[in-house]
Amino acid sequence: MIDLYFWPTPNGWKITIMLEELGLPYKVIPVEIGKGDQFKPEFLAISPNNKMPAIVDPDGPDGEPISIFESGAIMIYLAEKTGKLMPADPRGRIRVLEWLMFQMGTVGPMLGQAHHFRNYAPEQIDYAVNRYTREASRIYQVIDTRLADNTYL
């Protein structure tokens, strides 16, 4: 059974959804960020970036346990482990990785910043709010354009 170090963040949910879709058994180990659990040495040994999610799979690729942090790395690992949700053909694989990197490098960070500056910044910074709101709109347009002709990203 895979140990999933989790807190209900967008990246955490990505992994729980994937584990469910793959039908892999897992145990949720809460990492309460409000209490600082992400800074405890035992968690840092698994996720040196002190972010969720992270997993420990006791049945790693060589039969030995493996710990993995960063949601994209976890998703690629799980797809390769099961042979599901990742095309075998090189062109299909490139497309999946391309959109995964788009989500990780563009969607997540930009929407996270938009949310932060709109809802949590200690002071209203119009430049930041406007910049990230415009970028969020641009990102949604990229997604809409892709989905106009495709069932999935």
Name each model feature, range by range:
Residues 135-138, 142-146:
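Solvent-exposed, charged/polar functional surfaces in cytosolic regulatory/catalytic domains
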Residues 121-124, 144-148:
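Short, local alpha-helical segments
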Residues 84, 145-153:
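Surface-exposed helix-capping loop/turn segments at secondary-structure junctions
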Residues 1-137:
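GST-like domain detector, emphasizing the conserved glutathione-binding G-site
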